[in-house]
A protein has these predicted regions:
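Acidic, S/T/G-rich, low-cysteine, solvent-exposed domains in lumenal/extracellular/periplasmic regions
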Residues: 1-229
Length: 229
């Protein structure tokens, strides 16, 4: 919600450390208990206002694949190298950075990708970069197309992409006008229940600029944390 993004925005501007995990197609959410009654799961996540203010480009409608890092998967009709499941080994990780220097193998499943925004003044460091054999497909295709078709339809491009990165600098607020107003309630019952609740006052004054240089760690996949993979 905008108010949650605002809270994160102000937390970062006050020097708070943040690790952000996003995903255009979170498979872990497909088996979430919240979806056991047949609700359509929300598989994509995004923080557009915040990412823009942090100088990062990310498209939650696109999944990245990389033929160089393709993982062997069993499709039910045989084993194939599937570029949307990417295995990154030691040589693919930034060995100079303390966060990735001790890592050996990471599996990113149908991840998104980050790159530095064109007019960004922040410092963007890719900790896991994709190769020139990488490309993008629409995330919705993963629900309807078999792996072999997805692999064929992925169009390779040589643009710089990262699935794990750090953006650092003196950030500006994504909310220059201050805290967003509360969103309208979905039901009259919720609205009536909230009438008795006073607006929670802000604990701090609003900041439009960071008080000091800060850095944010970004991941474009959440499934790598799941025991399922």
């Amino acid at each position: 919600s905008p108010r949650l993004q605002y809270a994160l925005d102000q937390y970062v501007l006050r020097g708070g450390r943040l690790v952000v995990l996003l995903d255009p197609n979170a498979r872990a959410d497909m088996i979430s208990p919240e979806n056991q009654f047949g609700q359509q799961p929300q598989l994509a996540s995004d923080l557009p206002e915040l990412l823009n203010s942090w100088g990062v480009d990310y498209d939650s409608t696109k999944v990245v694949g990389d033929r160089l890092h393709a993982t062997q998967v069993n499709t039910g009709q045989g084993v194939m190298s599937f570029p949307m499941w990417m295995t990154f080994r030691t040589q693919s990780l930034d060995q100079e950075h303390p966060i990735t220097a001790q890592l050996e193998n990471l599996l990113f499943v149908e991840a998104g990708s980050f790159k530095k925004a064109a007019e960004s003044k922040t410092d963007f460091t890719a900790l896991i970069s994709l190769s020139e054999q990488s490309g993008l497909i629409d995330a919705f295709q993963l629900r309807f197309s078999p792996p072999d078709q997805l692999s064929r339809e992925m169009k390779v491009d040589d643009s710089a992409k990262a699935v794990m990165a750090i953006t650092a600098g003196n950030f500006s607020s994504a909310f220059p006008n201050g805290q967003p107003a509360k969103e309208k309630k979905e039901t009259q019952a919720k609205a009536a229940a909230d009438e008795s609740e006073a607006e929670t006052p802000l604990m701090h004054t609003h900041l439009n600029e960071s008080t000091e240089r800060n850095s944010i760690l970004l991941f474009s996949d959440v499934d790598f944390l799941s025991d399922q993979f």
